Structures are given as structure tokens and as C-alpha cells.
């Protein structure tokens, strides 16, 4: 594979991971805005499942050397920070 093809694949992989992360972020934002039922088990389960799936996607992309480990960790840490905000908000209600 040429360097350009590898770079293109890496950029595409990162963009796909970012898109999946943005979907999870939207779920978090919706829950923060509409915190009508604090700690809804179903909602928590969906978020946990999506986060786990994304972490597996990121791990796979890192192992294929399509995404740098640091970039993958940044995606997850940003979402974990937002999840922590959601948890704090639900505890206040």
C-alpha cells in the first residue's frame, strides 16, 4: 500500500470513529437537556453499550495502525468526561 493510501485509510478510520463518538455525544446531550428521569437504567445501558462498542472499534483501529493510540484515547476521554457530567447532573436531581 502506498503512503497516500495508508494516510487516506487512517483519515477515513478516524473520521468514522469521530462520527460514532458524535452519535454518543448527542445521546448524552439529549439526556442532559431532558433530565426528566435521573439514572434511567435503560438509558444508562444504551450509553454503556455504545461506549463499550466504540472502545472496541478504537482498539481495533489502533491495532491495525489506522489510528494513533493517543487520538483514540482522546475520543474516549472526551466522551467519558461528558458522561461524568451527565452522572453529576442526575445525582443533583
Curated annotation (Swiss-Prot):
Pfam families given in the database record: DUF1507
UniProt xrefs under InterPro entries: UPF0358, UPF0358_sf
Gene3D superfamilies linked: SO2669-like (1.10.287.750)
Homology family: Belongs to the UPF0358 family.
HAMAP family named in the record: UPF0358 (MF_01560)
Full protein name: UPF0358 protein ABC2396
Organism: Shouchella clausii (strain KSM-K16) (Alkalihalobacillus clausii)
